[in-house]
């Protein structure tokens, strides 16, 4: 099993994937996030955040208040399973997390917590 995925983000407020499948034989899983657009992070920054689907809206709302210096995430938010930092044009960041944090049958989503982005920039994370 390949225990990693490359995800690209764009100036059009999009990720290049809508679903990420994680093989349950993976002990850890790595997400490599890139930004192929031309806009800086304060204008069109993106991050990759993993949480239960039910927690996404609350994380995004609290993240807006936290601001860009905190990567639009409330510091120490226990609902966040994994996240990258906010990146802009030409930048990249990676995050590796323990697959044991995920439960089969639970609904997980990945999204960007930059204000207003999670309506379009989201997808499913499936453990199988």
From Swiss-Prot:
One of its GO terms (molecular function) is electron transfer activity. The keyword Calcium does not apply. Signal peptide: none annotated. PROSITE patterns: COPPER_BLUE. InterPro entries: Azurin, BlueCu_1, BlueCu_1_BS, Cu-binding_ET, Cupredoxin. Disulfide bonds join 3-26. Cu cation binds at residues 46, 112, 117, 121. Residues 1-128 form the Plastocyanin-like domain. SUPFAM superfamilies: Cupredoxins. Keywords: Copper, Disulfide bond, Electron transport, Metal-binding, Periplasm, Transport. It comes from the Bacteria. It is found in: Periplasm. The keyword Disulfide bond applies. Transfers electrons from cytochrome c551 to cytochrome oxidase. This is Azurin. It comes from Pseudomonas chlororaphis.
């Amino acid at each position: 099993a390949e225990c990693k995925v490359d995800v690209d983000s764009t100036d059009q407020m999009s990720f290049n994937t809508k679903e990420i499948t994680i093989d349950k034989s993976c002990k850890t899983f790595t997400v490599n996030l890139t930004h192929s657009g031309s806009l800086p992070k304060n204008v069109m920054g993106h991050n990759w955040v993993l949480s239960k689907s039910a927690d996404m809206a609350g994380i995004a709302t609290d993240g807006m208040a936290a601001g860009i210096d905190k990567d639009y995430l409330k510091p120490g938010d226990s609902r966040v399973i994994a996240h990258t930092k906010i990146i802009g044009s030409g930048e990249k960041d990676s995050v590796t997390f323990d697959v044991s944090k995920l439960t089969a049958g639970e609904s997980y989503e990945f999204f960007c917590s930059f204000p207003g982005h999670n309506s379009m920039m989201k997808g499913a994370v499936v453990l199988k």
